[in-house]
From Swiss-Prot:
Domain EngA-type G: 3-166, 207-380
Chain sites annotated for binding GTP 1: 9-16, 56-60, 118-121
NCBIfam families: GTPase_EngA, small_GTP
Protein name, as recorded: GTPase Der
Keywords for the protein's UniProt record, in alphabetical order: GTP-binding, Nucleotide-binding, Repeat, Ribosome biogenesis
GO biological process: ribosome biogenesis
Short name of one Pfam family: MMR_HSR1
Residues annotated as domain KH-like: 381-465
Binding site for GTP 2: 213-220, 260-264, 325-328
GO MF annotation list: GTP binding; ribosome binding
Subunit structure: Associates with the 50S ribosomal subunit.
Source superkingdom: Bacteria
């Protein structure tokens, strides 16, 4: 499961600066979630290939009462949700009473905590951080969040328990190394890696479905309607420490796993109480799912919170089905207004199917599975290099790439770069200089040609590098001898 990192500390110690620097690595700021806690922000970040969710908390003031109230209201909640806590202090201000008060609270929590001294740029870091050792939080990690210095090393140190450790390579003799090298070349020649990829059969894998949305949009009702229709609730299988429930089920001889973030446990225990909503549970469920059902309340329309959640789904590359709930009872006029609003605000996800349902009465719920299967198959379909290159050539013939610096951009070939979501890698000259409009044209062309529905499709561009760039023309010994003889001959003829 993707780890969760919380940033805590006094106001103005650089928590938001560090948050913005980390989330910019994936350009995936999830923004504020109104209705939860005002001063907490959630983001998705990646450092050196290691992904994590990060929480930016509001500053904790220096009074003892203030520490208690603010910690209880927001920072304490963030700490409880987190796997790792980064406790930020200001190296320029030095140790303050508020830092000591926060440290006392953190020492009472059983969490992996890293003491981070920020704003060490332009000062002697070793001298500046000396006082902070008295907090009893172990090693002090000096960083400069505004410039990024020390940030990567800090995150790598913090994520060590969550990074799978590779077994150390055995020490081989020279003969064994040579044998291993040739064996590896043989394996590549035989295409073993390709056979392993082809052996993956998505049909035999259960489809993991996450049902997400704002509070009170009907996630619990929809979950129980799906389970009640199929009557195949086997058992509740705990998924994570954050109590997301993984419920295996079967429909039409196809296996699924419902990831329930709404707190529903068993049929018969459904209440009308307000659904519990945890941002962390939702974000982790999205990361772990194959297909995400985004539930929207038809009576409330699309809020900024829905769009924030939608942005996270797209950045995660997950397949998407939009579910507009509470459709029953609306007048024809209101239904038309809702559809117009969906066209206006969700135009950028035109690849996703939209279903209008009533989870309470069951209308339209059964049709969801057609779109779920369609989205999953689109996301996991294997496409050959020959097919992708042919589609790329057709797109290029229909609409030539624009001129860049007086030269026509040339697309050479395309191949698959990954699945779930589908990634197409295009090689060519000056491809990174293509305007966004042409990149969107290519993406839509591939989507139409491959009939991809329900999943985002990504296109990556790679330059056709000159293999002789930055290489000196070194002569062989034979060429050197010929050159010497030629120069000697030229001298004699002068």
């Amino acid at each position: 499961m993707i780890p969760v990192v919380a940033l805590v500390g006094r106001p103005n110690v650089g928590k938001s600066t560090l948050f913005n620097r980390l989330t910019r690595t994936r350009d995936a700021l999830v923004a504020d979630f109104p209705g939860l806690t005002r001063d907490r922000k959630y983001g998705r970040a990646e450092v050196n290939g290691h992904e994590f969710i990060i929480i930016d908390t509001g500053g904790i003031d220096g009074t003892e009462n203030g520490v208690e109230t603010h910690m209880a209201e927001q920072s304490l909640m963030a700490i409880e949700e987190a796997d790792i806590v980064l406790f930020l202090v200001d190296a320029r201000d030095g140790l303050l009473p508020a830092d000591e008060a926060i440290a006392r609270h953190l020492r009472s929590r059983d969490k992996a905590t890293f003491l981070v001294a920020n704003k060490t740029d332009g000062i002697d870091a070793e001298v500046a951080v000396g006082d902070f050792y008295s907090l009893g939080m172990g090693e002090v990690h000096p960083i400069a969040a505004s410039h990024g210095r020390g940030v990567t090393q800090l995150i790598e140190d913090a994520l060590v328990p969550f990074i799978p450790q590779e077994a150390p390579a055995p020490v081989l003799s020279e003969e064994e190394e040579n044998a291993a090298y040739w064996a590896e070349l043989e394996a590549e020649a035989d295409g073993e890696a390709q056979e392993e990829e082809e052996a993956f059969d998505p049909i035999n894998q259960p489809i993991k479905i996450a049902i997400v949305g704002r509070p009170n949009v009907g996630k619990s009702t929809l979950t129980n309607r799906i389970l009640g229709e199929d009557r195949v609730v086997v058992y509740d299988m705990p998924g994570t420490t954050r109590d997301s429930i993984y419920i295996p089920m079967e429909r039409d001889e196809r296996e699924y796993v419902l990831i329930d973030t709404a707190g529903v446990r068993k049929r018969g225990k459904v209440t009308d109480t307000v659904e519990k909503f945890s941002v962390i549970k939702t974000l982790q469920a999205i990361e772990d799912a194959n297909v995400v059902l985004l539930v929207i309340d038809a009576r409330q329309g699309i809020s900024d919170q829905d769009l924030s959640l939608l942005g996270f789904i797209l950045n995660s590359g997950r397949s998407l089905v939009v579910v507009v709930n509470k459709w029953d009872g609306l007048s024809l006029e209101v239904k038309e207004q809702v559809k117009d609003m969906l066209d206006l605000r969700l135009g950028f996800v035109d690849f996703a199917r939209i279903h209008f349902i009533s989870a309470l009465h069951g209308s339209g719920v059964g049709n969801l599975f057609e779109s779920i299967q369609e989205a999953y198959e689109s996301a996991t379909r294997r496409v050959s290099t020959a097919m992708l290159t042919r589609i790329m050539t057709m797109a290029q013939d229909d609409h030539q790439p624009p001129m860049v610096r007086g030269r026509r951009v040339k697309l050479k070939y395309a191949h698959a770069g990954g699945y779930n979501p589908p990634i197409v890698v295009i090689h060519g000259n000056q491809v990174k200089d293509l305007p966004d409009s042409y990149k969107r044209y290519l993406m839509n062309y591939f989507r139409r040609s491959l009939n991809v529905m329900g999943t985002p499709i990504r296109i990556q561009f790679k330059e056709g590098d000159n293999p002789f760039a930055n290489k000196r023309n070194t002569l062989t010994p034979n060429q050197m001898r010929k050159r010497k003889r030629l120069l000697s001959h030229l001298k004699k003829t002068k």
